[in-house]
Amino acid sequence: MAPKAEKKPASKAPAEKKPAAKKTASTDGAKKRTKARKETYSSYIYKVLKQTHPDTGISQKAMSIMNSFVNDIFERIATEASKLAAYNKKSTISAREIQTAVRLILPGELAKHAVSEGTRAVTKYSSASS
């Protein structure tokens, strides 16, 4: 009978290998993969916050909530404007459809302020581009 192998003290299990990082330049000519960019309104929300309350900060969680809010309102207005364009047998959403959608979605005084600010922004854009 063969002698038993010596027992070694238990050591840490070998660490699991992490998947290899994306190659920057490979020899087979494959293109480098870039990280998918996440588009948010964070920078714009931050600029507006600093205009209204210069000494106030915002947490990452609050910024995430604000970003979700802006995306939600944008989607609601776009959907309503799309329906309005379809009702009028038009294939293009114009400023008029957006304005009507805002009036339908936002309540009372908030809609009035949004429409006046939107009109001001469109006027400013039109005068700057021409």
UniProtKB/Swiss-Prot annotation:
The record's listing under SMART domains reads:
H2B (SM00427)
- Species whose genome carries this gene: Candida albicans (strain SC5314 / ATCC MYA-2876) (Yeast)
Give residue spans, biased composition: Basic and acidic residues. Answer: 1-19
| Keyword Disulfide bond applies | no
- Annotated region Disordered: the residues are 1-38
Phosphoserine: residues bearing it: S11
Protein name according to UniProt: Histone H2B.1
Q: Which UniProt keywords apply?
A: Acetylation, Chromosome, DNA-binding, Isopeptide bond, Nucleosome core, Nucleus, Phosphoprotein, Ubl conjugation
Question: What is this protein's function?
Answer: Core component of nucleosome. Nucleosomes wrap and compact DNA into chromatin, limiting DNA accessibility to the cellular machineries which require DNA as a template. Histones thereby play a central role in transcription regulation, DNA repair, DNA replication and chromosomal stability. DNA accessibility is regulated via a complex set of post-translational modifications of histones, also called histone code, and nucleosome remodeling.
The places in or outside the cell where this protein is found are: Nucleus; Chromosome
